């Protein structure tokens, strides 16, 4: 087990959950806070339940609320996103999930800083320890390749409190 990269650190969290015999691992990043007193109750809501299509919910994601109170990404004005705005695509996904009739819906997106994994999933599918960024999307792809899905809970979130950006434009572009 390594401590280099988000995937490797999350695998350490999964290993600790296994050592202590926990059946659910909940992840948050260090620049987030849980403002809801029922955060952990909402984290496990629906886990191991079956959908009407007889699909078992083993991994789910909540979402981020930015410092202004919005779950949507601000459109980037950087030249690096001139031709393809990740924010625009992300906001389409979020709007569809936020306005869904059901609280928990199937998702192609996972917020790595607000996710819950049941042992039935994380004992079969670890995070890729060699991925330094984007481990959440990679995990969704790995789930799919093993016949599982990620689910989105539109009533479970964390408040994002990012530190002041100190990286150079070149460094941000490389990420």
Which stretches of residues belong to each language-model region?
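Active-site-proximal specificity loops/subdomain of glycosyltransferases
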Residues: 1-16, 20
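Active-site donor/metal-binding and catalytic loop motifs
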Residues: 146-149, 153-171
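Short beta-strand-to-loop element that shapes/binds the nucleotide-sugar donor at the catalytic cleft/hinge
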Residues: 54-78
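Conserved donor-nucleotide/metal-binding helix-loop-beta segment in metal-dependent transferases, i.e.
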Residues: 37-59
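C-terminal, non-catalytic tails of nucleotide-sugar-dependent glycosyltransferases
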Residues: 92, 173-175
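A recurrent flexible, glycine/aromatic-enriched loop bordering the glycosyltransferase active site
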Residues: 96-116
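Acidic donor-binding loop at a coil-to-helix junction in glycosyltransferase catalytic cores
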Residues: 132-139
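Short beta-strand-to-loop acidic/aromatic patch adjacent to the donor-nucleotide binding site
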Residues: 22-33
